[in-house]
Amino acid sequence: MAHIPSGGAPAAGAAPMGPQYCVCKVELSVSGQNLLDRDVTSKSDPFCVLFTENNGRWIEYDRTETAINNLNPAFSKKFVLDYHFEEVQKLKFALFDQDKSSMRLDEHDFLGQFSCSLGTIVSSKKITRPLLLLNDKPAGKGLITIAAQELSDNRVITLSLAGRRLDKKDLFGKSDPFLEFYKPGDDGKWMLVHRTEVIKYTLDPVWKPFTVPLVSLCDGDMEKPIQVMCYDYDNDGGHDFIGEFQTSVSQMCEARDSVPLEFECINPKKQRKKKNYKNSGIIILRSCKINRDYSFLDYILGGCQLMFTVGIDFTASNGNPLDPSSLHYINPMGTNEYLSAIWAVGQIIQDYDSDKMFPALGFGAQLPPDWKVSHEFAINFNPTNPFCSGVDGIAQAYSACLPHIRFYGPTNFSPIVNHVARFAAQATQQRTATQYFILLIITDGVISDMEETRHAVVQASKLPMSIIIVGVGNADFAAMEFLDGDSRMLRSHTGEEAARDIVQFVPFREFRNAAKETLAKAVLAELPQQVVQYFKHKNLPPTNSEPA
């Protein structure tokens, strides 16, 4: 989105000013219970150290204050971290009994530690876990409790404004008025926050309602002064000043649809020169509404679970899994492109599902005992319970099923898309933002049932569901790009348009020589936005959300 620099000329219909993105920060609060008592004459004096993992090494990130003589501390110092959904952010919390004033940790008694990912904490909002010693044995009865909170003001303010009897500035016409909104900057100068569009040839303009983040308009401070300037637009950039007034968000909140607020637009020069000067027109605030613009993290902290399903392509084009040239051949390192894709996506998403039980389905193979082709079978051969325990369970079931099936065809996606869509449709009956379904399809080739798949994806776009397709091997994946509606919205063969873009396609070959984290980032890049987009469209707030 283009922004007009401060002092530049606003085009008619200019875009809103201010940041259009949210830097997501998470605050972690830590407390301990029943900590080991390392002091002889008194209780321990614990403090907590947070370590983050960087290239396999633990790096100290921050530490809390020391709680004197306390085996059940609640630390007031918080840990603040940037949150990245598409990464596994490993954390280690270590507690020590302070013995000296030294900053060196080896000079303090170790009380226990706990390691997990940031995603694990965020998905539960609050966790309590046993502390472990360096030999992984329990640190007595010691426990650690970690609570997560998003550090962002997600409120947005929507203003609807008009003008009445503004000063005429053009010699042969009326005025072309627009408004600018300013807030006080840290340097004491006024900082431009928003500029409205220009309304041509009128002294009684009605501007389009606009929405800006509350933190952009007033830093979240409802009493902070806001300066509003009214100008007559000139093509040469020398806009003529009409007048100004000051207000605050708390004052503007008094405006309602039935009771507008009116502000006199004052030109100080005219006010000083003319004794009978009244004003240079009236600015009318027709309505002021504050709402919450919920983020992906709001929904996760609100208890939304990500329901993960894997669909694996077992068609003959993959090659015999015993042949090293086959895409299903498991190399001496115990992996292949299918397993790499499962790990890359699954290790992120499994942190956001409390029971970590994931259905794993296959398609395009002949199954024993009658060797009929199936496009929707449980790879653990248990159709009533296709669930695998975590990503490890999916990998084990995948490896175990390979010798027992015959690769066949064709490459039909629609049965598995419809399978997950049925569960997503059931979840909508709850009318809450508690479940969102993610289908990972890993395939080596061209879709055989493109019309049926297009129809299935268009129908799924109305549900709490996203589809990630990872293409393995070196086939032509042009059809997959067609399903990924980044450039244009997908339509079914009947002409029905998808409600939103829910497909993300990534060719594995582009990541063969990259770090494994790179694939996860690319594959999951659009998912948070898709989750938020769906729940917003359905007007479903996070389950524990506060009113604005």
Curated annotation (Swiss-Prot):
Annotated tissue distribution: Expressed in the brain. Expressed in neutrophil precursors from the bone marrow and peripheral blood.
Function: Calcium-dependent phospholipid-binding protein that plays a role in calcium-mediated intracellular processes. Exhibits calcium-dependent cell membrane binding properties.
Highest taxon listed in the record's lineage: Eukaryota
Organism: Homo sapiens (Human)
Domain spans labelled C2: 5-131, 138-263
Domain remark in the UniProt entry: The C2 domain 2, but not the C2 domain 1, is necessary for calcium-mediated membrane association. The linker region is necessary for calcium-dependent cell membrane association.
Organism lineage: Eukaryota, Metazoa, Chordata, Craniata, Vertebrata
Segments forming domain VWFA: 305-507
Alphabetically ordered keywords of this record: Calcium, Cell membrane, Cytoplasm, Membrane, Metal-binding, Nucleus, Repeat
Gene3D superfamilies documented for this protein: C2 domain (2.60.40.150)
GO annotation, biological process: cellular response to calcium ion
Comment on bound cofactor: Binds 3 Ca(2+) ions per C2 domain.
Residue sites binding Ca(2+) 1 per the record: D39, D45, D97, D99
Entry's family note: Belongs to the copine family.
Region of interest (Linker region), residue spans: 247-304
Record's protein name: Copine-2
